[in-house]
Amino acid sequence: MTKQQENEQVPGMREQRFGIEIELTGLTRRAAADIIGDYMGTTPVYIGGFYYVYEIPDREGRQWRVVLDNSIKVECKSGIANDEYKVEVVSPICRYPDIPDIQEIVRQLRHGGAIANKSCGIHIHVNATPHNARTLRNITNIMASKEDLIYKALQVEVARKHQYCRPVDETFLDEMNRKKPRNMDEVSLIWYGGRSRRSKHYDKTRYHCLNLHSVFQKGTIEFRLFNSTTHAGKVKAYIHLCLAISYQALIQKCASRRKTTSTNEKYTFRTWLLRLGLIGEEFANTRKHLLEHLDGCIAWKDPAQAERQKERLRARREMEENANQEGKENLEGRDVSNPMTKTGMEEKMEEGKLYVAYGSNLSLTQMRRRCPTARVVGLAELMDYELLFRGRRENAFATIEPKQGSCVPVMIWKIQGDDELALDRYEGYPHL
């Protein structure tokens, strides 16, 4: 198959099929099944069996399931909880437009008393059919390189990290990148370390944040690293993240395994989310939920840049405060009863010069000391320039430099008489 043919078969991010498993307690399996049935307008059917299964058909005839999960520690808001309160909701194979239904089911379950405690998790399965040996190596490297940031962003419980969603296995990672398998059988040999155990449901290799045992057992890539939640927006964010990672693995020629380190986690992770395609208004809440637990500044890569921006904003506020105070003093000193009193515009046009001052280096007090006749007559913006701070700390100074599309807030001072010469000697404050 040529590269072009391979690319033509890759589904878009929103075209991938997926499923979700949500572990909960706080209500019984029967109550959860009834809530889903009420939302779908259908009647749950008790199937029974080892997992005490309830099946609930949706509007398209697909089956939602509510089953027992013995890893859940039960609790309820009132009374005594028993094993009936071990609830796992399993979706059918879903499409991207099904996400709002999944969110509403989560909301209805929360209203019905559902609790997501520390023993509960969420597993998301993405269809593995479009993937091959190369893309599975890509997704392994993507997860290995970003897993430290992902664990922190998702606030994965320490117990879950060490038991049910361990990091990518280093031996598997090394072998995948050293051998570069060409087909799925070769990937299977590396994953299991020998003979395939795909028929075993509870194989020990499944308990990783990226579970490829699921690829060989049921044809899905499983992401196991999410704490369970009854927050519908977070559930949507988790689905978006899994679909985006899977899609990135499909379209990239290769991916680096190198660990991502950063002095500004929030900026680094946000940049990665944008590269994954989680950009624009549609994914605004997704980015919000995935970034809220990370440290750093979202807007600036270098923390020093953020500090300089704060200084620029502080300078602008000081200019505005000085201008307002000067204007207030001018109004208080004006004889408003005299109809011949000059208006502000007329005063600006009388003999003298108008000067522009940027930043806060030349405050009202300093200007008055240099030029006793100085006063603020307005605020403006200097177009196609930017305000920069040169030097470090106590030696820093402000300057403006040309930059297309930018603007610098400035104060307009009025200077008269001999004071013009004093200000002309002060470098950086040109008159208009």
Model feature map: region roles:
Residues 69-71, 92-94, 127-129, 412-418, ...:
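Beta-hairpin (beta-strand-turn-beta-strand) motif
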Residues 2-115, 129-346:
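C-terminal accessory/tail domains of diverse enzymes
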Residues 15-17, 117, 360, 380:
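Short, surface-exposed loop/turn motifs at beta-strand boundaries within globular domains
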Residues 119, 217, 350-352:
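Short, well-ordered loop/turn elements at secondary-structure boundaries
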Residues 33, 121-122, 220, 270, ...:
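A generic alpha-helix preference that emphasizes hydrophobic side chains
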Residues 118-122, 126:
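Short, conserved phosphate-binding/catalytic loop or strand-edge motifs used
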Residues 344-432:
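Glycine-aromatic micro-motifs
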